[in-house]
Structures are given as C-alpha cells and as structure tokens.
C-alpha cells in the first residue's frame, strides 16, 4: 500500500501524527505514527504514506518527502502541518515553490498553553477573528505581550508567516486547507481501532495495523464524495 505509485498531482499535502507505546528492547517508549495525506488534482483525498519514528527532525522529514517524490508525488503547492521545525525546514528544501501552512488549531492550542484558563475562551476568539490577516495577528501578539503573556505572544509571532499562506489559494478551499482537521479525524479512528492492543511489541506490528486501517480509510475517500472542487473541474 505504501509502495504504490502516486498517479495524480497533489496540490495540498497534510501531515499529522498520533502517538503509541511501543516496546524497544526491554523498554517501553512513545513513538509517532506519522501520516501523510493529500488532496489530489481531481479534488479527492488520498492517504499517501505513513511511518513510525521516534525522531522528527529535518532529515527524517526530508527523507520521507523524497520517498513520496520517488513514488510520483508532484504538484505540491501547500503543506499543512503543526509547527514542528523539522517539517517546516524540510518543506522549504523538498518542495521548491510550495508554501507551508501552520495548522490554526495547533497554533491556538500552543498559544493557550500559557494563558490562564479564565482567559482562554477570549484569547481563542481573538485568534479566530485574526487568522488569515497578518496585521490583526500582529495586533493579537502585541496585546498578549502587553498583558504579560510573552510566551504566547512569541508563539503567534513565530508562526505568523505560516498562518496566512492558505489565503493565496481559492477562497472556497480555505476552510479545509487552513488546518489538519482532515487528518485529526483519521488519527481519532487510528486511536479507536488500536486501543485494544495497548502496547505494541515492535515498530513493525504498529505500522502493519496502522497500514491496514489507513487502507480502509483510503478506499472510503477515493470512492466517496469529492473533498474539494478544483478549478479544472469547473471548466
């Protein structure tokens, strides 16, 4: 499944991870099952690849992206993920001319991590209204800084360039390309169906089960409803 050719251009690429306990020798460690999916040129979703790792640095991501390109991945214009520096750097070198979009949901979570609970709802609303507008996001950062929440202000400023890239694409796509929600639902299904295992004996057992679940999801996606209406479909 993860060796098959990628036959269509993938303008929108989504990356997300879920975490599992895996036995590593005599130890039990947490490892990431990273899933890469995309929206094809015909508007349908497709699961492109998955890998188990305990290291998410730039070299890992660059290697994974290279494997996908060797299988035929082309046409990438936007990569949507969390704020992991390794992904950001790998996108800039692996997909020349493509943009990186910070998932707005992940950004909000990161900002609220350092905000008192009584203010979280209000700050989340500020962010919701500001996303997609560079000036308004900077105003939110300045406001948080003035209130003494420097860490949260730094988070907004650090991700700011990557929070507005989705606005360069058709407006009708915005809702679905500004977050990794498409993969969040996949990860929930993975968690639900792997729960019975508890701890995996090795990486291979984890990727086997994850792979079989992703195959089922991929079949549903390809045979289901078109996820986005692409420009070529309207002509």
Name the predicted role of every residue range.
Residues 129-235:
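Acidic/histidine-rich catalytic cores and adjacent linkers
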Residues 9, 75, 99, 174-178, ...:
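A generic hydrophobic-helix recognition signal that picks specific residues
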Residues 1-80, 85, 89, 94-97, ...:
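RNase H-like nuclease fold core
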Residues 96-113:
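Inter-helix linker motif
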Residues 111-133:
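Conserved phosphate-handling catalytic cores of large alpha/beta enzymes
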């Amino acid at each position: 499944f993860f060796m098959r050719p990628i036959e269509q251009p993938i303008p929108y690429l989504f990356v997300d991870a879920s975490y599992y306990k895996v036995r590593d020798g005599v130890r039990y460690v947490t490892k990431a099952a990273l899933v890469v999916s995309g929206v094809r040129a015909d508007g349908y979703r497709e699961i492109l690849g998955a890998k188990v790792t305990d290291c998410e640095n730039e070299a890992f991501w660059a290697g994974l992206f290279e494997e996908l390109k060797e299988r035929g991945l082309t046409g990438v214009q936007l990569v949507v993920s969390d704020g992991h520096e390794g992904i950001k750097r790998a996108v800039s070198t692996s997909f020349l001319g493509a943009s990186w979009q910070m998932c707005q949901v992940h950004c909000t979570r990161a900002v609220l991590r350092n905000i008192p609970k009584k203010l979280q709802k209000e700050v989340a609303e500020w962010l919701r209204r500001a996303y997609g507008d560079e000036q308004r996001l900077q105003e939110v950062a300045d406001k948080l800084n003035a209130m003494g929440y420097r860490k949260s202000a730094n988070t907004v400023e650090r991700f700011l360039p990557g929070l507005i890239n989705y606005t360069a694409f058709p407006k009708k796509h915005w809702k679905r390309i500004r977050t990794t929600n498409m993969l969040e639902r996949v990860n929930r299904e993975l968690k639900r169906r792997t729960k019975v295992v508890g701890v995996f004996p090795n990486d291979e057992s984890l990727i086997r089960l994850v792979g079989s679940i992703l195959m089922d999801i991929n079949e549903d996606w390809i045979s289901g409803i078109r996820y986005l209406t692409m420009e070529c479909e309207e002509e």
